[in-house]
Amino acid sequence: DQQRNITSFLQIYEEHFDGLGFDGVFLDKIRYGSFSNGLGGVFSCFCPACMKRYQECGIDVDELKHQMGLVRDGAGGYGEQVLGITAYDKGNYTFAHPVWEKFYRKKAEDIARALKTVTGYFHARGMKVGMDTFAPYLAYFAGQDMKRLAPMADFIKPMMYRITNAPAGMPFETDCLIRETVRCNGTQMGMDARTRARKAFFEVLGCHDTG
């Protein structure tokens, strides 16, 4: 439960850190899971609270699950096409199937709503608020919408880790995105297919893949 977690977090701060004279706080891991957690870490969740949110966001859950199944199987035109992405512009993706935009918009709204409460709490105490986020082209998939977060933060530090082969590192997270979504007959495709998919993905981003 998001609200319960927020309340617990702020209670911990008040019990152990309030009054120590901090000038500000730095918020990290303010996101949903990434593809480094596998497809299951991204294609979730379907608890009652999330089901209600899907309805509020106008998401056809049956169609969403169907499209998720097609990605898992590498069917329905996905295959080497990462989630059927057709365009990228200033941190936002366009997909061949509109359910994905609604799905990721819902995630972004959830993160922003939680952070509005948390950042408001600290700003009311005269404290600065900083945020750690994924690199912009990856942040989208974790529910981090920079345009939504910017008004709440005094500064944002995107993790532009160009050579880090570990979670949050750009090459690592990109490889996980490609590996998990480029599939055929329910299994991950070989290196040649992933290389082609990676090249196509970077072409959509409008940049060169340096490996």
Residues covered by each model-derived region:
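Polysaccharide-binding and catalytic clefts of secreted carbohydrate-active enzymes
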Residues: 1-155, 159-210
